[in-house]
Amino acid sequence: MEIRAAEISKVIREQIEGFGADAEVSEVGRVISVGDGIARVYGLDKVEAGEMVTFSSGVQGMALNLEADNVGVVIFGSDLEVGEGDTVRRTGQIVDVPVGPELLGRVVDALGNPIDGKGPINAKLRRRSEEMAPGIIPRKSVHEAVQTGIKALDALVPVGRGQRELIIGDRQTGKTAIAIDAFINQKQVNSGSDNTKKLFCIYVAIGQKRSTVAQIVRQLEEMGAMEYSIVVAATASEPAPLQYLVPYSACSMGEYFRDNKQHALIVYDDLSKQAVAYRQMSLLLRRPPGREAYPGDVFYLHSRLLERAAKMSDKMGAGSLTALPIIETQAGDVSAYIPTNVISITDGQIFLETDLFYQGIRPAINVGLSVSRVGSAAQTKAMKKVAGSIKLELAQYREMAAFAQFGSDLDASTQKLLNRGKRLTELLKQPQFHPMPFEEQVVSLFAGTNGYIDGIEVSDVNRYEEAMLSYMRSSHNDLLATIRETGDFSDETKSKLTAALDNFAKIFA
């Protein structure tokens, strides 16, 4: 084969001209010290706050403290895999997670990796964990109801789509139970084909026991609620940085639905454990402690998370993200640091009491201390008309009950008020995993506020309610359907319902 010098020189010239002079520069630092999930790194001069870094062992971390001579990195994993002198590389990326409908029905960790053994998640989109909350102009007032299926909530402390309603109470008072019941109650609305009415659910477990998370997942699966839910978990055995990060990651998953003309409901269980994880990280990073040893920006920790829950304007697609943060109190002390912070950020609170719980009043909602700052704007017309008087009657009952302990001779009107109050309190009791459809709640509360249960023994109120609803389903299903479809309670519906309840009163014994 003949070799031509001209061809060789041409090839060499082309190679020289096409040679890329831009060498890839990757900034590398070294670990000075490591311990308690924190690594001090030297040499990452251009690293940005919140940037992901990778250690030579493959473990990831996040740069949180940028100091003059070193960088404080929190480790997303075991610090046993990171040693002094190890190399650390910048990734140039902020923490992001997979988002989209592909996550529905799955259990993932704080970084969006599946932990349910059902294979990889092929999400088409990713989104940063920390996103800016929507401004004032893209928002709209809350005006649609989130039907929780819990009578005491839907009637007295209504939650609207886009609202932030705090669930607060001591341990073992049924905080998580309220959230799970709200998830289960979305089954009917999610079985339809209209995506703008559906409400997707996200449960965020922060610092919970693994057995507790497994139990919640099993309950959601048994009730058929897992298919429209995502469970995001950073359990008690996981490092503090992941417990700190998990609410933000889960919120990004919820924001996908909010920004795509859909609706999502997110439960943070619970934010006191996130604050404890953040306090641990801050103290180890040598940040100055404040009240109760929490860092100075612990308010901002929760406010920047909860502000991301919003009802978007029609121009922005009219989607919404509703947040139900949970806070655990110690011995009912709502004036502690974290509870007061979160109460001031949210649009109302559901206050659960141990005493009520042990008296058998479940859900153990203290109606006097619980409030929704959105109020009746988040209720349907039917519920507004029926539940308007119940809150006042219960408030009067509690006031009178306190006085009645001291006096035995009470006049007839006071006696009537006390009797009605006892029966209404009984009517608002509800077993767990039995959320009630909206139209049945309306009928039940109408019977309660219009004297149909006044002549019934307190112990028979629940039996009356079950029998009455069963009668309504079998004989007056059209009436229930009208309330459900119109969401209103017209005079015609009222007269029909009154006649039906009068009829039932004759046959109930």
UniProtKB/Swiss-Prot annotation:
Its EC number is 7.1.2.2. It is a peripheral membrane protein. It is found in: Cell inner membrane. It is an enzyme of class 7 (translocase). The keyword Cytoplasm does not apply. CDD domains: ATP-synt_F1_alpha_C (cd18113), ATP-synt_F1_alpha_N (cd18116), F1-ATPase_alpha_CD (cd01132). GO terms for molecular function: ADP binding; ATP binding; proton-transporting ATP synthase activity, rotational mechanism. Keywords: ATP synthesis, ATP-binding, Cell inner membrane, Cell membrane, CF(1), Hydrogen ion transport, Ion transport, Membrane, Nucleotide-binding, Translocase, Transport. It comes from the Bacteria. GO terms for cellular component: plasma membrane; proton-transporting ATP synthase complex. ATP binds at residues 169-176. It catalyses: ATP + H2O + 4 H(+)(in) = ADP + phosphate + 5 H(+)(out). The record marks 370 as: Required for activity. InterPro entries: ATP_synth_asu-like_sf (IPR023366), ATP_synth_asu_C (IPR000793), ATP_synth_asu_C_sf (IPR038376), ATP_synth_F1_a_nt-bd_dom (IPR033732), ATP_synth_F1_asu (IPR005294), ATPase_a/bsu_AS (IPR020003), ATPase_F1/V1/A1_a/bsu_N (IPR004100), ATPase_F1/V1/A1_a/bsu_N_sf (IPR036121). F-type ATPases have 2 components, CF(1) - the catalytic core - and CF(0) - the membrane proton channel. CF(1) has five subunits: alpha(3), beta(3), gamma(1), delta(1), epsilon(1). CF(0) has three main subunits: a(1), b(2) and c(9-12). The alpha and beta chains form an alternating ring which encloses part of the gamma chain. CF(1) is attached to CF(0) by a central stalk formed by the gamma and epsilon chains, while a peripheral stalk is formed by the delta and b chains. Produces ATP from ADP in the presence of a proton gradient across the membrane. The alpha chain is a regulatory subunit. PANTHER family: ATP SYNTHASE SUBUNIT ALPHA, MITOCHONDRIAL. Belongs to the ATPase alpha/beta chains family. This is ATP synthase subunit alpha. It comes from Zymomonas mobilis subsp. mobilis (strain ATCC 31821 / ZM4 / CP4).
